[in-house]
Regions:
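Primarily recognizes Gram-negative and organellar outer-membrane beta-barrels
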Residues: 1-393
Length: 393
């Protein structure tokens, strides 16, 4: 990482917060034709939050003042009891921060709704004008910012009913996420000297597309059901972090930045059926998988350049169970396996391929007077972790 100098800082923060919000909504629907409607909705939302952080700087105290104390949860009084002066005398007004955040949001949506016997479809657009104010006193600088933006998001929802027990649904929506006011402030927060945060006034809004498919069916005669779904989402100009290091102090600076390349996908299939006409013997299987890709920017050490960091997660899972059911007894055996693979292109030490296993059974006796007696036994195992203590049974 470099040849660092010794840097010592003792700081104590008190940060009371207060927040509230309220909303008012109205909806109107106008028939256009048979089973076709145009729906308008409006909602006003107001939100308020306040933070009043006091930072006390104990860096002037002799080295080792708190060396005899062992860290413990909520043990602040142990540290404050060693101060040589009243706590108020250590208050640093520059490092303390007071802020107020107000948002005024208008949600306006128009939706075309078509309702038929076999299918239903909703197509619409949502507009969201938003006005925000942010006031802050920090580092001797007074900030009073105002921002007005208009977010928009199209929506699509289609449902098809094959019969009373089988249906298909396809859904699409998109959202625009604006960076927060604090992320846009061009201010460096070094309250924690080793973990510095920095704003970025050049942030762009993030735009996310989401697609979902869902299908389920049920056959009463065989007590047979099937369900499957698939999700996919991708984000343009996602707001991630850029992490850099100071070669002199070893301090880490985190700044929000726009990154591209974030997407994820999930899918699953469930099948349940009885294997005899009486429904006494049953089997169930649930298969699932997901893939996630996240991007950020990282400086691996003080002398290297900032590089794009890609982290990928792959998860596969399977659960299988079988059961025997009568009017007074239910016996079930089940087992599951989950595989997770994570890969980081810059930090190979974080790459992992892990397995989790679970298997066992349960037994339930039905007794008179609506009473029951149950017991179960399961074994859980984990494998593939770098720390041997985590590879447990």
């Amino acid at each position: 990482m470099g040849n660092y100098k010794t840097y010592r800082a003792y700081r104590y923060n008190l940060m009371p917060t207060k927040s509230w919000d309220y909303a008012l909504q109205a909806t109107y629907s106008e028939p256009l034709a048979r089973k076709t409607y145009l729906q308008f909705s409006y909602q006003f939302k107001y939100g308020f939050s306040k933070s009043d952080r006091d930072t006390y700087d104990f860096s002037s105290l002799p080295s080792g003042t708190f060396g005899s104390l062992k860290p413990a949860y909520r043990s602040w009084d142990n540290y404050l009891g060693l101060l040589t002066n009243p706590l108020a005398s250590y208050l640093d007004s520059n490092l303390s921060r007071y802020s107020e955040y107000r948002t005024y949001t208008h949600d306006m949506q128009v939706m075309l709704r078509m309702l038929h016997t076999k299918w239903k479809m909703n197509v619409g657009m949502k507009l969201q004008p938003q006005h925000s104010t942010y006031m802050q006193d920090y580092l001797g600088v007074h900030v009073d910012n105002k921002r007005s933006v208009v977010n928009w998001s199209p929506t699509f929802d289609f449902r098809y009913k094959f019969n009373a027990q089988s249906n298909l649904r396809i859904n699409y929506n998109s959202t625009v996420s604006q960076p927060s006011m604090t992320q846009l402030l061009d201010i460096v927060d070094n309250t924690d000297p080793q973990n510095i945060s920095k704003g970025n006034p050049n942030l762009k809004p993030a735009f996310t597309n989401r697609f979902r498919l869902f299908y389920n069916a049920f056959r009463q005669k065989h007590a047979q059901s099937v369900m499957t779904f698939a999700d996919f989402s991708t984000t343009r100009n996602a707001i991630g972090n850029s992490v850099t290091y100071d070669g002199t102090t070893g301090a880490r600076t985190v700044q929000p930045v726009n990154v591209n390349g974030n997407w994820d996908a999930n899918a699953a299939v469930m099948f349940n059926t009885s294997i005899d006409s009486a429904g006494v013997w049953n089997i169930n299987t649930f298969t699932r998988g997901s893939f996630n890709r996240y991007a950020s920017y990282l400086q691996q050490n003080a002398t290297s350049a900032v590089e794009k960091n890609i982290t990928k997660y792959l998860t596969l899972g399977e659960r299988l169970s079988a059961s025997y059911r009568t009017s007074w007894l239910e016996l079930a055996l089940d087992g599951s396996v989950d595989y997770t693979h994570s890969k980081n292109n810059l930090q190979s030490l974080n790459n992992l391929s892990t397995w989790q296993f679970s298997y066992g059974g349960s037994l339930i006796f039905s007794l008179p007077w609506n009473m029951s007696l149950s017991t179960d036994l399961h074994q859980n195992s984990r494998r593939g972790y770098n720390d041997a203590a985590l590879n447990t049974n």
